[in-house]
């Protein structure tokens, strides 16, 4: 069996419990086709770089999968049909990462954004304050 990293984006207007239900549905599909689901990272609700089907935010979920190609094809087929899934991508990898993904490591334990993003937001606020202080 091959190793895959699979990420999907779910609509912003569904409940977090529905995201977990989608995840368990796709896990059962993978296991029914003889595959195994490894690490699962739920990155939560995050902003999108651009609007996708009128959504500005989405729930991001990353899954490590050890499964045959038929299982991946079936999961992708079902995601294509499901209206709650905005985008998905599957990448074949040589080995799964042991530590957290780069995106997940930027989140702290409470689910807050990382320091780099916080710094950029504070500098943006300072620039906006300076602009507002200028009289025309």
Swiss-Prot record:
**What spans are recorded as compositionally biased (Basic and acidic residues)?**
117-130
Q: Does the keyword Lyase apply?
A: no
What residues form the membrane-spanning segments? none
Q: Which GO terms describe its molecular function?
A: small ribosomal subunit rRNA binding; structural constituent of ribosome
Question: Do the record's keywords include rRNA-binding?
Answer: yes
What cellular component GO annotations does this protein have?
cytosolic small ribosomal subunit
Q: Where is this region: Disordered?
A: 117-136
InterPro entries hit by this protein = Ribosomal_bS6, Ribosomal_bS6_sf, Ribosomal_S6_plastid/chlpt, Transl_elong_EF1B/ribsomal_bS6
Q: Which GO terms describe its biological process?
A: translation
What are the disulfide bonds? none
- Give the SUPFAM superfamilies listed for this entry: Ribosomal protein S6
Q: Which UniProt keywords apply?
A: Ribonucleoprotein, Ribosomal protein, RNA-binding, rRNA-binding
Q: Name one matching Pfam family.
A: Ribosomal_S6
Tell me which family the UniProt entry assigns to this protein. Belongs to the bacterial ribosomal protein bS6 family.
HAMAP family listed in its UniProt record: Ribosomal_bS6
Main function: Binds together with bS18 to 16S ribosomal RNA.
What is the protein named? Small ribosomal subunit protein bS6
Originating gene: rpsF
């Amino acid at each position: 069996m091959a190793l895959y990293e699979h990420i999907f984006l779910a609509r912003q207007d569904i409940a977090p419990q529905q995201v977990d239900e989608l995840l368990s549905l796709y896990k059962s599909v993978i296991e029914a086709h003889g595959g195994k689901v490894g690490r699962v990272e739920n990155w939560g609700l995050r902003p999108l770089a651009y609007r996708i089907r009128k959504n500005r935010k989405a729930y991001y979920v990353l899954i490590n999968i050890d499964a045959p190609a038929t299982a991946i094809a079936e999961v992708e087929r079902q995601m294509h049909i499901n209206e709650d899934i905005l985008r998905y991508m599957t990448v074949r990898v040589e080995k799964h990462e042991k530590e957290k993904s780069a995106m997940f490591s930027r989140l702290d334990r409470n689910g807050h954004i990382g320091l780099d993003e916080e710094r950029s937001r504070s500098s943006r606020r300072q620039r906006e304050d300076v602009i507002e202080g200028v009289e025309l």
